[in-house]
């Protein structure tokens, strides 16, 4: 098996890796490959082998998912930080429990406070401002594991 990985500078200045496989395709684990943001080209060429729930959580798969909306797992997509536009267009399919933990969904959550799962939001590192405005709804156990919540925890230490 020959695996070649090239580094690509992503638009957001994050390093992304594009995976080129020269391998017997019967040896590929399509479940895990469907989760790999660097494998989108290979997955696009082998749509029949995609694990759609796994792909729905793949941040690199938004274009492919947009072309196959009928195959999306909406629970998994609701946790995908790059899927906010797709979720907004399919508002009635959002899983709000999963979305509450999604760091990319803060604006959507702020606009729909009545739908928030406060335990999952308490774990969301991007939700500190929203949590600060709703201290009475915080799940303090979950917040304790939130790496962005140290200031909020210390300010509310009993």
What are these model-predicted stretches?
Residues 8-158:
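Alpha-helical scaffold segments
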Residues 2-7:
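Compositionally biased low-complexity segments, especially N-terminal hydrophobic helices
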